A protein has these predicted regions:
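Loop-to-helix transition at the N-terminal end of transmembrane alpha-helices
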Residues: 34-49, 154
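Membrane-water interface of transmembrane alpha-helices
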Residues: 84-103
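Juxtamembrane boundary at the C-terminal end of a transmembrane helix
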Residues: 138-154
Length: 154
């Protein structure tokens, strides 16, 4: 899969899970007899949110986005559906075009340690996926332990 395909797949999933979570919140407010729906939808959305953030960072590094663009992608995921206009802008500016950077190019940035490490992982997608899933699982577990975001500062 190309960076564009991965980003679009995860971005679409993030928007769909926002809709799922908001729907279950509305049902709960209307007296839903199955209140576990919010827990399930929230967990699914939380996992997809973390996946979106990880894919935005990985694709952003690969495509050499400025830090502000990567930070924008991640922070806009906090607001329901705010990633949709951002994603359209990425499409229009062709910021998602190109293949994975698995080999060094003539770009001087390819000589630094971070780009070499990044290319090493990108050239080993199963290892990268295993590392990302491990990190996201640890983060997801920590967030589950902390409880809903509305209770973090009580």
């Amino acid at each position: 899969m190309t960076p564009k395909q991965i980003y679009k797949f995860v971005a679409t999933g993030e928007a769909i899970t926002w809709a799922l979570l908001i729907s279950t919140l509305v049902l709960r407010a209307l007296g839903d007899p199955i209140p576990v729906g919010v827990l399930v939808a929230g967990s699914i959305h939380g996992a997809m949110f973390l996946s979106y953030c990880a894919s935005a960072v990985i694709v952003g590094v690969n495509q050499r986005w400025r830090f502000g663009r990567v930070a924008g992608a991640v922070s806009l995921a906090i607001v329901p559906f705010a990633t949709l206009p951002f994603d359209r802008r990425l499409e229009r500016s062709q910021a998602l075009e190109g293949n994975w950077r698995t080999e060094a190019s003539s770009d001087p940035r390819d000589a630094n340690w971070f780009d070499r490490l990044f290319r090493w992982f990108i050239a080993r997608p199963w290892l990268l996926m295993l590392a990302v899933v491990g990190i996201l699982a640890a983060l997801f577990t920590t967030l589950l332990h902390l409880g809903p975001p509305t209770e973090w500062f009580d």
